[in-house]
Amino acid sequence: SASPTKMYVNGSAAATINVLVDGATVTPYFSQNNNFTITLAGNRTVANPVGATPGQSGTIYIVQDATGSRTLSWGNLWRFQGNTAPTLSTSANAVDMLVYSVRTVSNVSCQLINNIG
């Protein structure tokens, strides 16, 4: 049910996981989804998200390919603890989980959880 200021869900709620297109620059479209996954086939740059809305939150699963040791660099709107981009797990097929919350349209606060399986 919904009111002008609140929405209540009795039961569970789920959102799909959108597959990001792998390429030299990866662009997450926050206007289309909250949750994403990407398998890295090389060192990549994650561009600033398109269509970010303050209060939006979600998850990006980052998967190493069979080679592993892939790296990511990040657009200037992504904010990490200590203003330092995190280091990904490097094993072949490793999975890391980036949890994010859009604080403002120019600040996406993030935390990386390494090697979740």
Question: At which residue positions do the language-model features occur?
Answer:
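Transition segment at domain starts
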Residues: 12-34
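N-terminal non-cleavable signal-anchor helices
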Residues: 10, 27, 106-109
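C-terminal trimerization/auto-chaperone modules of long, extracellular attachment fibers and adhesins
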Residues: 1-14
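Low-complexity intrinsically disordered segments
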Residues: 2, 22-24, 87
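Acidic, glycine/polar-enriched metal-coordinating patches/loops
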Residues: 38-117
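Short, surface-exposed charged micro-motifs
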Residues: 6, 25-27, 99
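N-terminal start-of-chain detector that recognizes signal peptides
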Residues: 9, 28-34, 68-74
